[in-house]
Amino acid sequence: MTSKKHIGNFIIIVWIIFLTCITLVASHAISARINDYRAASDDYKAPQIISIDPEDMPFHTDVFFGTYLNRISRLSMKESNFDADFYIWFKWKGNNVSPGEDFQVVSGQVNSKQLQAELHEGDDHYEQYQVTASITKPFDVMLFPFDDHNLTIKIEDSLYSIYELKYIPENSQDVRISPEINIPGYRVKSLDPISELHRYSTDFGSPWKDTVPSVYSQIVFGIGIARDGLGIYFKLFQSLFVAVAVAMLGFFLKPDYAPRFVVGVGALFAAVANYYNILSMQPIVGYITLADSINLIGILTILLFLIQSSISFYMFDYQGKKELSWRFDKYSAVIFIIFYMFINWWIVVIASH
């Protein structure tokens, strides 16, 4: 009798160690993946340094610019684009360039462009435009729903390269975005307008080999958005959490009671349905997002519950070890609840900081 009891205790201990290892491995893997992703993102965002010899552009025109983002009228991560309404103005000297007439939106299209004001006095020129544009933006949703993004608008001259036109940001403006900009579920911050060089990996078949027109001065401005609190997290996964909680109730049912397995299978279908709902909110990507991982953890938890129920049923019905089955259920219930809450808490802590 003592030997059988020791075997039963050994089975429970092995099961607890197994669940502990799964929890620790999953927690470490997810946190390492998040940290590696952020490190890689920082390297990717590092500005590319493009050197231009000033002697190669002795006759370029300096064009001073300013921007004011009025609103983001539409944002779709699923479709990888957004619409913006903004003001942009240019100041320059001379008649060699026409920045207001020739500018274009990189990776997007201008839907409307209206000249709001202009002043031309001798060589001094000023033009102000109101523009609405649609911009293509491949959103990186690796950390969804704890993701943040920069909604940037990039402006280039469609005719003149850096050798003829150079954008220079004005520093006289403190407010660069409308205080009425509101994107539900996100905090909004202003990004300082900058001018940078954009190199195209082609010479466009240019016959002028001495001055290759593949480097352009580029205006970059916009806003940064970050998730506002944990509201979206709980909204996305409340169905999943309820499904897991319902499955946990099965621990309090007798192993040979058929509805115990029905509860687990029903919870599994609910978790899978929630996963399809999450997939419908994300763009089609070739990697597993954080939301995918959270949902897969819930599905795995329910699957492990069904495995545990099968083992407990075998102990209870086939071996007649009702007391061992009861202890197995009791310890499993405590371990499942603690470990599932821990791994979700760990994900929130790592992803939100």
Language-model segments: residues:
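Channel- or pocket-lining gating/hinge segments that regulate access to a cavity or pore
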Residues: 220-339, 345
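Membrane-helix interface motif
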Residues: 33-34, 278, 352-353
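Short, Lys/Arg-rich N-terminal segment immediately upstream of the first membrane anchor
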Residues: 1-8, 323-327
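Soluble non-transmembrane domains of integral membrane proteins
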Residues: 26-220, 224
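Acidic, low-complexity intrinsically disordered regions
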Residues: 11, 88, 204, 322, ...
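Juxtamembrane boundary at the C-terminal end of a transmembrane helix
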Residues: 345-353
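Alpha-helical hydrophobic membrane-insertion segments
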Residues: 6, 13, 30, 331-334, ...
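Hydrophobic membrane-insertion alpha-helices, especially the h-region
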Residues: 10-27
